[in-house]
A protein has these predicted regions:
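Walker A/P-loop nucleotide-binding motif
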Residues: 1-13
Length: 143
């Protein structure tokens, strides 16, 4: 998990890691958390959720960006949890986020589900903390 302040390079690091994995021949899938939830909802509504989860599961690296930036309703949290649970102990997952750990219940709409997600992340994972001044604030294109 890449965790920290806005603009400190979490997404940049996630993309760079994904690109390096691709260069080494690994299949990689990249989603924002909200786009992944929308994709899974659409697949479920079209009765093809299992096929979508299998397609995502073919990646050896799953990158989920912006996890926690937007609240996810309980239905979306369950779908995201399902994708994450399918990845647990079978593939590498990079997630980039910035909410404080105490806010995960708000993000997932359910404290128990948040605890289960965090439990799986910390079991085999590493949390890399990014902090400092926002790169975008330091190097604005608008002056």
């Amino acid at each position: 998990m890449l965790y920290g302040d806005v603009g400190c390079g979490k997404t940049h690091m996630a993309i760079a890691t994904g690109m390096l994995a691709c260069e080494r021949g690994m299949p990689v899938r990249f989603f924002t958390a909200s786009s992944l939830v929308m994709r899974l909802r659409r697949a479920r509504d079209e009765n093809r959720l299992d096929a979508e989860l299998r397609a995502i599961g073919r990646a050896r690296l799953l990158v989920i960006d912006e996890l926690g930036y937007l609240p996810i309703d309980i239905d979306g949290a369950r779908l995201l949890f399902q994708a994450g649970a399918d990845s647990y102990e079978t593939r590498s997952v990079i997630s980039a986020s910035n909410p404080e750990s105490g806010r995960w219940g708000d993000v997932f709409g359910d404290g128990d589900m948040a605890a289960a997600v965090i439990d799986r992340i910390v079991h085999h994972g590493r949390i890399l903390r990014f902090h400092g001044e926002s790169y975008r604030n330091k190097h604005p294109l608008m002056k």
